[in-house]
From Swiss-Prot:
This protein's name: Uncharacterized lipoprotein YsaB
Cellular location(s): Cell membrane
Top-rank taxon, per record: Bacteria
Residues bearing a lipid moiety (N-palmitoyl cysteine): 18
Gene this protein is translated from: ysaB
UniProt topology in membrane: Lipid-anchor
S-diacylglycerol cysteine: lipidated positions: 18
Primary localisation category: membrane
Keywords: Cell membrane, Lipoprotein, Membrane, Palmitate, Signal
Species of the source: Shigella boydii serotype 4 (strain Sb227)
GO cellular component: plasma membrane
Signal peptide coordinates: 1-17
Length: 99
């Protein structure tokens, strides 16, 4: 009687271990128009200069990251104050976060 329950349980365990792994998902990369990224950088520098009460020439943007529905630019002031500018998928400025 135990054998009748043992074989289906073993067969189920063997079949579960044989399932194929799911394919690796990769993020889509869209090439950003250089003019758009330069405009976003200028807007980010302008907003940071206003927030930190300094000139745009004293603002450095160091990183540009693309996410699924947005963009972020990281930077810092000459006083080493860090910030992040966020943009929507169309490149419109959303907000500036001080770090």
């Amino acid at each position: 009687m135990m054998m009748n329950a043992f074989f289906p349980a073993m067969a189920l365990m063997v079949l579960v271990g044989c399932s194929t792994p799911s394919p690796v998902q990769k993020a889509q990369r869209v090439k950003v128009d250089p003019l758009r990224s330069l405009n976003m950088e200028a807007l980010c520098k302008d907003q940071a200069a206003k927030r930190y009460n300094t000139g745009e020439q004293k603002i450095d943007v160091t990183a540009f990251e693309q996410f699924q529905g947005s963009y972020e630019m990281r930077g810092y002031t000459f006083r080493k104050e860090q910030f992040v500018c966020s943009f929507d998928a169309d490149g419109h400025f959303l907000h500036l976060s001080m770090r």
